[in-house]
Amino acid sequence: MAARMDPGIGGEVTLLHTSQLDNLINLARASSLYYLTFGLACCGIELMQTGGPRADLMRFGAIPRASPRQADFMIVAGTLTYKMAERARLLYDQMPEPKYVISMGSCSNCGGLFQLGYSVCKGVDKVIPVDVYVPGCPPRPEALTEGLLRLQEIVRSEPWSTKRRPAAQAEGA
């Protein structure tokens, strides 16, 4: 749908209604997400199981990548220490926009069993903005698959032409 406006001296400007284009692009983006794994402890083992033939994230369009520059989202799985938090932030900063984060397991979400340790970060969201939390200790591959489906819903609902605000930043504003 197109509309015409007269901006004054410059002539006519054509405005386009892009909601159908947004839907088409978001459907393509949600169906081909590349992920970066950041497995740190026992949740990392479940993360590997999710990529295996029984759970197979690839059937949902999620493809693992070794480089953060090729990844759309990062899965942080396991206990995040302050020393590893610097590396997680560095990898997150190297990812292209729009970028998303899934926090997998109790240790990533809030520190989990090791939260009283002096070197344990009390949640990934203290270091990088998180979009989807997957609970469990460790979460089953089915739970991570549900987290991926939730992330796909988030990607489908966003307008692709605007700069996105991660969930953690949006809550703080």
UniProtKB/Swiss-Prot annotation:
Any one GO BP annotation for this protein: aerobic respiration
Subcellular location: Cell inner membrane
Alphabetical keyword list: 4Fe-4S, Cell inner membrane, Cell membrane, Iron, Iron-sulfur, Membrane, Metal-binding, NAD, Quinone, Translocase, Transport, Ubiquinone
Entry's cofactor comment: Binds 1 [4Fe-4S] cluster.
One term under GO cellular component: respiratory chain complex I
EC number: 7.1.1.-
Disulfide bonds listed in the record: none
Its membrane topology: Peripheral membrane protein
Molecular functions (GO terms): 4 iron, 4 sulfur cluster binding; iron ion binding; NADH dehydrogenase (ubiquinone) activity; NADH:ubiquinone reductase (non-electrogenic) activity; quinone binding
Required cofactor(s): [4Fe-4S] cluster
Annotated positions binding [4Fe-4S] cluster: C42, C43, C107, C137
InterPro entries linked: NADH_UbQ_OxRdtase-like_20kDa, NADH_UQ_OxRdtase_20Kd_su
Record's keyword annotation contains Membrane: yes
Catalytic activity: a quinone + NADH + 5 H(+)(in) = a quinol + NAD(+) + 4 H(+)(out)
Coarse class of the protein's main subcellular location: membrane
Keyword Lipid biosynthesis annotated: no
Function: NDH-1 shuttles electrons from NADH, via FMN and iron-sulfur (Fe-S) centers, to quinones in the respiratory chain. Couples the redox reaction to proton translocation (for every two electrons transferred, four hydrogen ions are translocated across the cytoplasmic membrane), and thus conserves the redox energy in a proton gradient.
Similarity comment text for this entry: Belongs to the complex I 20 kDa subunit family.
Subunit (UniProt): NDH-1 is composed of 14 different subunits. Subunits NuoB, C, D, E, F, and G constitute the peripheral sector of the complex.
Protein name, UniProt field: NADH-quinone oxidoreductase subunit B 2
Organism for this UniProt entry: Anaeromyxobacter dehalogenans (strain 2CP-C)
